[in-house]
């Protein structure tokens, strides 16, 4: 969709917002239905949202970044979708985008260790077709290369000894 196009009933649109409070950032995204959407669009949105929570459940102190990506990727691919690889989640703190990168694909037990106090954004971007995307000339708009539907959900979480804590519930 071109940024000049108007949204119509049946479209889905992703909105990604950041906020800053007392010098610290938060990052949150969701995909919304414009009116009634096709069963395919609803299923894609539901799968993407649930893959976010699969990733969050895998974000345990002592685990690895790859555990998160593997949880997201396994859930998504088991349902016939693909995970965008060009964009990933990230650390969050005094800057909106910090290390470490948090891919939505990966191998369990690989990557940096998750430690209590780490704050990260997990943000699966899931395509109904292939995983390739293209950035439009405006430098912001991203479309799937094959024209398929895509959905995106994100939460900022803190790793704690008692499990992950979601910081961006709205």
Predicted regions and their residues:
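Active-site neighborhoods and metal-handling regions in enzymes and metal-associated proteins
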Residues: 1-170
């Amino acid at each position: 969709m071109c940024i000049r196009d108007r949204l119509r009933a049946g479209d889905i649109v992703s909105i990604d917002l950041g906020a800053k409070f007392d010098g610290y950032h938060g990052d949150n995204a969701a995909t919304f239905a414009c009116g009634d959407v096709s069963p395919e669009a609803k299923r894609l949105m539901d799968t993407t949202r649930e893959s976010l929570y699969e990733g969050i459940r895998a974000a345990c102190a002592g685990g690895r970044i790859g555990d998160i990506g593997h949880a997201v990727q396994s859930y998504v691919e088991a349902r016939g979708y693909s995970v965008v690889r060009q964009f990933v989640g990230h650390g969050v703190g005094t800057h909106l985008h910090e290390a470490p990168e948090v891919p939505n694909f990966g191998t369990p037990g690989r990557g940096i260790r998750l430690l209590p106090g780490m704050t990260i954004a997990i943000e699966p971007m899931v395509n109904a077709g292939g995983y390739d995307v293209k950035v439009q000339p405006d430098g912001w708009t991203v479309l799937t290369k094959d024209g398929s539907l895509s959905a995106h959900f994100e939460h900022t979480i803190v790793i704690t000894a008692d499990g992950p804590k979601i910081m961006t519930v709205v």
